[in-house]
């Protein structure tokens, strides 16, 4: 039987859901769950990427047989910058961190929101990736 694994990592927990077809119907079973949360790292709310990676691997190991594929869903706005060799060059600061409180107003001075919205269709939310990344240049 072919199985497919979905890994959903949210702000407070993560879970692994195994799916398969049985008699033409989709079956789903939660096989692994873990707690999650951003932690203070030098005054910033950050995700513990090493622990999250370990939790994903542990959840895959909880499958009785290797799934045909694995899909991972996380937050839409957070990121980690990587160096040329693939090493992390900054922490994974969480979207809930307060560092972007004033950024939309600052960025609006050089990049109008109407232009951003026209290009992306994304509402102005202070935690959007564009505002996080713009901190590097403001």
What are these regions (language model features)?
Residues 1-90, 118:
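N-terminal glycine/serine-rich phosphate-binding loop of ATP-dependent small-molecule kinases
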Residues 61-136:
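Glycine-rich phosphate-binding/catalytic subdomain of phosphoryl-transfer
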């Amino acid at each position: 039987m072919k199985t497919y694994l979905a890994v959903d990592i949210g702000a407070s927990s993560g879970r692994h859901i195994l799916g398969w077809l049985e008699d033409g119907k989709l079956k789903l079973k939660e096989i692994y769950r873990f707690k999650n949360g951003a932690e203070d790292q030098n005054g910033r709310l950050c995700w513990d990427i090493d622990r999250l990676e370990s939790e994903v691997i542990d959840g895959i190991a909880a499958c009785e047989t290797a799934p045909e594929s694995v899909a991972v869903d996380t937050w839409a706005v957070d990121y980690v910058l990587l160096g040329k060799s693939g090493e992390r060059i900054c922490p994974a600061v969480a979207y809930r961190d307060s560092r972007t409180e004033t950024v939309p107003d600052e960025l609006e001075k050089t990049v109008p929101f109407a232009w951003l919205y026209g290009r992306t269709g994304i509402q102005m939310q202070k935690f959007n990736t564009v505002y996080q990344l713009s901190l590097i240049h403001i």
